A protein has these predicted regions:
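Mature catalytic domains of secreted/periplasmic carbohydrate-active enzymes
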Residues: 1-174
Length: 174
């Protein structure tokens, strides 16, 4: 997408070339799996003021872009918000209690998990990273899906010296 809007170039490809040229390992960081719940505020609207009741852009669709600078792009590919909000979603502090996909978190759809999986596998295949960091507990979508385990397996099969990092591990996961 960065080739079509924004910088109009493949940013990760530039980093991969630079790392290879300098003899450095390439690391890629992934944060999108929790976009499902973390972007839920984009579905909301103002409760007061002159924009009271006007929904934020997390509810926009590709059709809403006709005649606008983002025509042809689907905001749902960014926000992934075509789903019910999690329990207590209007409480900004609640999201941390739902980090492990529990405590009333709206579980991600199969399509969302598949999209994350496909994009991550594509990045591994294109850029051959040595390190992958997931901003998650254990692996992506743990414990509700084996998607993260399949991604880690793919990296290790492609690069036996590869390293996978997760944000939060307990003693059972180390």
């Amino acid at each position: 997408l960065s080739q079509n809007i924004g910088p109009k170039k493949d940013i990760l490809e530039g980093w991969a070339r630079a790392a290879k040229k300098a003899g450095l390992p390439l690391g890629i960081s992934f944060h999108a799996d929790h976009a499902w719940t973390w972007f839920e505020p984009s579905q909301r609207y103002d409760l007061k003021g002159d924009k009271k009741g006007v929904y934020y852009d997390g509810n926009l669709t590709k059709e809403d872009g006709k005649g606008k600078w983002w025509e042809g792009l689907d905001p749902q590919m960014l926000y992934q918000q075509n789903h019910p909000m999690s329990q207590g979603s209007w409480d900004n502090g609640r999201i941390h209690a739902q980090w492990g996909w529990d405590n009333g978190a709206c579980p991600p759809s199969k399509e969302f998990v598949t999209n994350f999986f496909d994009r991550t596998i594509d990045a591994i295949n294109r850029y051959n990273p040595d390190l992958i960091y997931f901003d998650v507990t254990v692996l992506p979508f743990y414990p509700i899906s084996d998607c993260g385990l399949k991604i880690a397996t793919h990296l290790y099969n492609k690069n036996p010296r590869g390293v996978v990092f997760g944000k939060i591990l307990n003693d059972d996961h180390k």
